[in-house]
Amino acid sequence: MTAARPSLLCFGEILWDFLPAGLFPGGAPFNVAYHLHRQGTGVLVVSAVGCDLLGDELRRRLEGWGLDTGGIARHPDLPTGHVRATVSARGDASYEIVANVAWDRITLTAEVLQRVHTAAGLIYGSLSQRSLHNLAALHQLLAVLPAGAWRIFDVNLRPPYDDPDLVNRLAAGATLLKLNAAEAARLVSGQSESAGREEADARTLAARTGCPTVCITAGDRGAGLLRSGQWHWEAGRPVAVADTVGSGDAFLAALVISLMGAKLSDAACLARACRIGEWVATQHGATPEYPAGGKL
């Protein structure tokens, strides 16, 4: 399917989430792409699926949503990825990630190699960099991305794929670094999350990596944004949680759109992202249907 020329690329895993409520398309970079698309931003998913029924169905779903599949390669031997997700009584999800799958070997398609030269930004995560093949592909994209394009690094530490040194290297040169409070605490001090330390951790990470914008999410407590040396905090609002799968990805999509649009204050950008993330937490799965017009 050919869609409008995308302004953003999302590099990384695309897979199936095996949830108690059913099978849902997932993978953080794909989830972000879905929400960018639903919120009116052009995007190209850069990933891989297998030559199997699950891969066929993923592509069919994306095309049905109007997403361009030209950046999704087909791996001849490896299967389409999936994770087994368990949701707790309060809606929090934990994951068992299956290894040696198609998204571990992302091949950059001709469409990706053409569009990266005019992209406004590249969103990439840490999980897909568990393979050296993908790490090389990511560096290939970063090397030819326009100088003024945003480099958005979405940390996703999932044991055993949680190398702090790799995360620090990938964060260097990023325009925006996004991670949760537990990940920030681990990277900064090696300790557990502690409420109230988000600003200090964000400033430490900004100084360590040189990243000018650091966002730390803290679940239902809210989220913080460090930008141009100024710290902003937006408290979470109570919602009826169905599950939290994809809420952080929807948050990131909204934050990126708002910050890149440069029409709202940084505090307003953060608040908008929180509200959209909260709405997704009231829905099942990472890719809920948006209201007509995509407005929330």
Q: What is each model feature region?
A:
Residues 15-17, 129, 158, 183-185, ...:
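A short, flexible beta-alpha/helix-coil linker loop
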Residues 17-92, 97-103:
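Substrate-binding N-lobe of the ribokinase-like
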Residues 12:
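Active-site beta-alpha turn of Rossmann-fold NAD(P)-dependent dehydrogenases/reductases
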Residues 6, 17, 38, 44, ...:
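Conserved post-catalytic alpha-helical subdomain immediately downstream of the catalytic base
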Residues 25-29, 134, 248:
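Short, conserved glycine- and acidic-residue-centered signature motifs
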Residues 80, 217, 244:
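Ser/Thr-centric signal marking residues that sit
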Residues 29, 33, 55, 81, ...:
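A general structural signal for well-ordered alpha-helical segments in protein cores
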Residues 1-9, 61-64, 69-74, 89-231, ...:
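Ribokinase/PfkB-type carbohydrate-kinase core domain
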